[in-house]
Amino acid sequence: MRPTVRPDTAGRIVRAADDLAVWLSERGQSESAEPFTFVVALDGLLRLAPRRSEHVACAGGDDVLAAGEMGFRRGSGRWTVHEVTNQSTGYCPDLDSWHAVARALDRAGIDHPGRFTHEIVFRRCERCQERSVVREGDFVCVFCGSALPSAWNLAP
């Protein structure tokens, strides 16, 4: 997919809370009520794109520190993150990618819940090489039935 990513599809960079407020105001009320696709680029900055965007496109085809979906709520005159996940089947980020998300949000002055509100555990099956989601702590490949490794193994 990376070769097909055009530079104009990269997500909106959010350096400050005002950047977020402007971008969300451009989205409209119904779209702003949905979660958005996000990545934290290698420069540590948050990038946002509409929910149905591919994470790889949001990142401009580059590697990332974190990826997932993020939802916002407005309260006390400002936008805050009320839900955030590492749900990205393109990048399959590990749970420790939260640290990059928190740093990007803190840097921009955007309040957040302090963790992923919904965590997804990804692993690559060493036997069949498929990407799998670990459900309910069951580290078994849904494709071939082999045991999945306990440590994250989906680095680019």
What kind of feature is each model-predicted range?
Residues 1-64:
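General detector of N-terminal leader/presequence modules that precede the first folded domain
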Residues 38-39, 70-72:
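Broad, structure-driven detector of short, well-ordered beta-strand segments within folded domains
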Residues 42, 66, 119-121:
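A generic structural signal for well-ordered coil/turn residues at beta-strand boundaries
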Residues 42-43, 73-77:
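Short acidic-glycine loop/turn motifs at beta-strand connectors
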Residues 45-46, 79, 139:
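Hydrophobic residues embedded in beta-strands of well-ordered beta-sheets
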Residues 46, 61, 66-71, 83-86:
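Extended, well-ordered protein cores
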Residues 51, 75, 86-89:
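Beta-hairpin (beta-strand-turn-beta-strand) motif
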Residues 85-156:
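Cys/His-clustered metal-coordination modules, chiefly Zn-binding fingers
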